[in-house]
Amino acid sequence: FTSGSTGEPKGVITTHRMLCANQQSIVQCWPFLEDAPPRILDWLPWSHAFGANHNFNIVLRNGGSLYIDDGKPVPGLIEKTVANLREVSPTMYFNAPRGFDMLLPYLERDEQLAQSFFRQLDLIFYAGAALPQNLWDRLEAAAIRTRGERVRMVSSWGATETTCTCTSVHYTIEKAGVIGIPAPGVEVMLTPSASKMELRVRGPVVTPGYWKRPDLTEQAFDAEGFYKIGDAGRLDDPDDPAKGIVFDGRVAEDFKLLSGTWVHCGQVRLGVISACSPVVQDAVVTG
């Protein structure tokens, strides 16, 4: 079921084809998964699309090891995550930006923990929200200080209705905010919507519809069969689409001033956080 954060929760039909297509897409993005079984420490529940469809199935698909983290990035539980990371050196580490924000102070002051964390790490994966540039810079600095080189920093973009992954950053990038290029087997279309470009998705990872809600299913797809996800994006470099797409917030979150000027909330928020870092960790744009 979707989270229902902007409406009633909807049952998303998830097929075996979707799950298999998603994992095949991931392993084509990260071929090293077939060379060495992944080792993952994860706190996400399996009732969560990312926790199950992505993380659990990566381990299942590639014969890896999944260690269940009984901590999580909240006060009183982050300490359990830190203790677990002393015992388990992951090869892939997934978290939301808030999780890295809470973990970084421990990595920066505890050399033994940093050694355990970075020892065998192939990639750091952030998702769920935009990663502020100051957190990106601190993670890179911690990796270089600990192992003498950067660790690959990656992300992706998707939804419950798309199994998980629609776009993937599986190439080197120098800054936060890029959500990558369409994953293998996935088509992404940018469609004008008011002042933004709406992202629409088609491919074998997309749900056939909502459980017992043909009315909502019909509304969710356009005439060409693309799923209308409701997010907006723009090309990082209009002259070079291969550099990827930048997440541009929700289509409906922007507003217009009395002057007629559009306010792009997502861009303003990230700009404020970046300009005021490290004093400001988050910002809310209203109007």
Residue ranges and their predicted role:
Residues 62-64, 82, 91-94, 104-178, ...:
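Gly/Ser/Thr-rich phosphate-binding loop
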Residues 230-232, 236, 275-287:
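C-terminal boundary motif of the adenylate-forming
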